Amino acid sequence: MGPLIFSRSLIFFLVIVGLLLPVRGDTDMLGPLTREAVLKNCPDWQEVVALYQPDGPAIDGLQAFNRPVQVEVFLGTWCPDSKAHVSEFFKVLDLADNALISATYIGIPRDKAQRSEYYQGKDIQKLPTFLVFVEGQEKGRIIEVPLKSMEQDLLDILLR
């Protein structure tokens, strides 16, 4: 009788987990991505974008920045830190509305053994990682969690 109960419990657990995982939106979107594709495939990220309230003075500083900036964002669509902070980054770019600041997004797999091909030879240890380039030179990184806020950390890097 004991093994039968264990088997039923295990089957019940596996069925429940199997039903819940798709609801959580833990999809692996890999390689080059667009913001639009991320938000379409991970709709719960849209709520973070909508609710995030960036700091006004930092946004003003980003709006006024007058040199070309490229941000490479390495993210996992399955990763809670990516959901939180890449979504914040989306909102920051929206509000900064600076044509000189652009971003590219690279989706990284959950399986660490498969990640190196996506890192393009860059030293990426945690997700998300934002590599900030000004006029083609790397000026700094935001790794996993901003120190102050997404907008302030980005502005601090740009003003170095």
Spans of model-derived segments:
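Bacterial N-terminal signal peptides that target proteins for export
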Residues: 1-11
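Bacterial N-terminal signal peptides
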Residues: 9-20
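N-terminal leader/targeting and pre-domain segments
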Residues: 25-66
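Conserved helix-turn-beta segment immediately C-terminal to the redox Cys motif
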Residues: 63-70, 88-106
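Thiol-based oxidoreductase modules, predominantly thioredoxin-like and allied folds used
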Residues: 73-77, 100-114
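Conserved redox-active cysteine motifs that mediate thiol-disulfide chemistry
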Residues: 77-85
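Non-catalytic, surface beta->alpha helical segment in thiol-disulfide oxidoreductase systems
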Residues: 126, 132-160
